[in-house]
Structures are given as structure tokens and as C-alpha cells.
Amino acid sequence: MKEVLVLALMLVLIAGASYAEEIKEWDISEMIHPQLKEGLKRVPYFELNSETLGFLREVLGGDFSQLPKDEAVDVRNETLPSGLRVRIYTPKTGANEYPGMLWLHSGGHIAGSPEAEEWLLLRLAKGAGCIIAAPYYRLAPENPCPADIEDCYSALLWMSENLPIRKDRLAVGGASAGAGLAAAMAQMSRDKHGPAICYQFLLYPQVDFVNDYPSHHQINDSRVWCLSLHLAALKWYPADFSGDYVSPALTEDLSGLPPAYILTGTLDIFRDEAVSYAQRLMQAGVLVELHVMPGIVHACEFLFPNAPVCVKIMDNYTNALKEAMK
């Protein structure tokens, strides 16, 4: 019931937003979910600039080999003829075929790696019983857009042809920037008559680089992904933001796209664009399961994976993915 009320409020805010008056920043220390308040106090403030970008990349793309593995999931790397590397997670169930999902990692298009999210991918592969292929797509600014989009689509084509995946159960998913890329893959595959996509699994999606939303300005606390970090990342992501598939929310025709699971939080900087995109998908006849979680910041489970509310969020979307993969 709380999610329904929150969603109704968000739709009113988006529909009636006026930018004639300055939008006030919110104090997330007071508004964050009670279970996350103490944890937030331990998160340092972060400034993204040319000096700290290297640190961010090291944190999100470093050596994770010492982290715990799951004996129920096989993990290996493959290299495509193009040189693109893909990390593959396969449940050890002995099946001849599996549902499959292309997973696109977060990191603002400028950082990140599959290993940084391996703890989650192991959980999803095991819990949903699906093969997950996660490409090391090229990052900006060294590789300007659409390099990332091209790599993601190449990985989608490759996995559909080379992995033991059921042709009727191929999903696309991701978190944050990766969720935006996943939404783009669903559109791109539809338009190019590529692999049939059965499901969009979009966590905290960033889908609109062009339009301004109230949530962009309300969330500007740099302990979480916020306006200042978002604007800094944009400087290193040179792109025609209105170009094909860069901002999936700008696509006029959303009909014929696969069902979508969309997760955001009331304290997520991308909250309003996620809700707006969900609304437009529904208007186009697409089945959408939308969750707007009260008091939740952007990618909260990445920051507080052991908090009960975050565990519940992960359990919920793992179960949703499992149902979609049947």
C-alpha cells in the first residue's frame, strides 16, 4: 500500500512540476529509511573530478578475486572475436538449456565492471536459475558513446547464439547506467529484429539525459549518487544525448517492448525519469511492474547489502526475475 501511495505522489509531482521556482534539496539524512540511517553516517562524501575518477575506477574495477564465491554457480570469462570480454555466470544444475539475461553493470558509463557486482550476479543466477552474461563494455571518456551501446548489443547477439539459452527466455537487465543500457537493448533488438527479449529488469534506471526532473535537484547529497556526481560524470560521457538509444525515455514508439520490472526509491536521483518511463511504457501497452520504495536511495543494496530492507528488496526482485524466467 505504501508503494502505491508513493507512486501516486510521484506521478503528481512529475505531471505538475514547474521549474519557475527553485527546487529545494532534500535532507536525506532525515528522510532515508530508518534501517539505513546509521549506515549512511559511515558513508563518506565524495567529489567526482579528474583526480578521483581513477580512484572510482579502481574501486569498481579492481581485483575482486578474494571475495567469496558460490559453489552453485560456475563463473568464467569469454572473449569475443572483436576482443570484447564477457563474464558468464551459469547455475550448476546440469540443465541442457537455461533462461538467460544480459547484465549491464553500473558506473555512470565511466567506471564499473562485472566483478564489482558479482555478489549480486551470483545471487541472481542462483536464485532465478538463469545464465547471466555481463560484458566489460567500453567506458567513456576514452571510448565515447555509442561504443558502450555497440558493445552491449554485440554481447547480446553473441550470447543468444553461443550460450545454452532458451530462445523464448532471454532478458536484459542492469543497474543505474546499466539499466539504461538494458532498456536501450530492448529497443534496439526490437528495431533491428534481433533476439527476442522476454523481459526488462531495470534497477534504478537512468534513461533520460535530456530532460530535467525534480528528483535531480532534490537529491544532492554526495554520499549517494546525486546531482553533483551526475553532472560530473556527464562531462566524461560525450554523446548526442538525444541520439538513438542513448536516452531510451526519448524514444517515441515504445510499443512492442517486453514486460518490464522497474525499481527506484523516493530518494533516488533518477526516481522521476524511472517513473515517467514506466508510465509511458504502460501507455504503450507494455506490462510494467513498478516499485518506488519509500526512503530508499539510489542503488541502496550496493551500499547497505546487509540491511534488512535491502535484503527484502533483493529477495523481491530475485523472485520477480525467477517468475519471468519460467
Task: Tell me the role of every PLM-derived stretch.
Residues 18-20:
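Boundary at the C-terminal end of the N-terminal hydrophobic targeting segment
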Residues 23-326:
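Alpha/beta-hydrolase superfamily serine-hydrolase fold, recognizing
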Residues 4-14:
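Sec-dependent N-terminal signal peptides
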